Each structure stands twice: as C-alpha cells, then as structure tokens.
From Swiss-Prot:
GO CC annotations, alphabetized: cytoplasm; cytoplasmic stress granule; nucleus
The name this protein goes by in its record: Mapk-regulated corepressor-interacting protein 1
Modified residues (Phosphoserine): S21
Biological process terms in GO annotation: gene expression; negative regulation of gene expression, epigenetic; regulation of epithelial to mesenchymal transition
Modified residues (Phosphotyrosine): Y41
Keyword 4Fe-4S: no
General function of this protein: The phosphorylation status of MCRIP1 functions as a molecular switch to regulate epithelial-mesenchymal transition. Unphosphorylated MCRIP1 binds to and inhibits the transcriptional corepressor CTBP(s). When phosphorylated by MAPK/ERK, MCRIP1 releases CTBP(s) resulting in transcriptional silencing of the E-cadherin gene and induction of epithelial-mesenchymal transition.
Length: 97
C-alpha cells in the first residue's frame, strides 16, 4: 500500500470573491452593524458621563485617559475628525444628488 501526500489548503490572504462595498453614496447597514454601533455609542456615552461625574465631584478616578509615553511616529500627522459632522456632510451630499 502506497501512501499519498496529504493535500493542504493554502491561503494567499486575498479575498477575490468577497462582496465589494457599494460605490454609490447610500450605504446599506445590517441590523447587526447598527446594533454594534449603538452598543459602542452607548458604552462611550457611559464613559464620558462617568468622567464628567468624577471631575465634578472630585472622587477617586474610575476613568483614566491613556497617553503614550513615546508617541508613535506614524501617527504624527493624524488629525481626529468629528464623525457627526462627517455624517451630516455625507447626508447633505446625498440629498444634492
């Protein structure tokens, strides 16, 4: 009886068959996506509420801001954006078209 080599599946890391995101300005959000966004939003609102509360009452720190001791050089040009403003602008652009 001869033994044949075991076949192996090799992945190259590329996904050619994955669906592409919509190219038009109207995005499609699944209920799971909306639930995840809502969870993150509510959790962050809780953190901000706790931080405001602790700052006004002077109580022991429950929320602590993380600041890197050695900044990442690749983030030197990073500029945070206001997501609410970005969404508002995208909504206005969609209404114009």
């Amino acid at each position: 009886m001869t033994s044949s080599p075991v076949s192996r599946v090799v992945y190259n890391g590329k996904r050619n068959s994955s669906p592409r995101s919509p190219t038009n300005s109207s995005e499609i959000f699944t209920p799971a996506h909306e639930e995840n966004v809502r969870f993150i939003y509510e959790a962050w609102q809780g953190v901000e509420r706790d931080l405001r509360s602790q700052l006004s009452s002077g109580e022991r720190c429950l929320v602590e801001e993380y600041v890197e001791k050695v900044p990442n050089p690749s983030l030197k040009t990073f500029k945070p954006i206001d997501l609410s403003d970005l969404k508002r602008r995208n909504t206005q652009d969609a209404k114009k078209s």
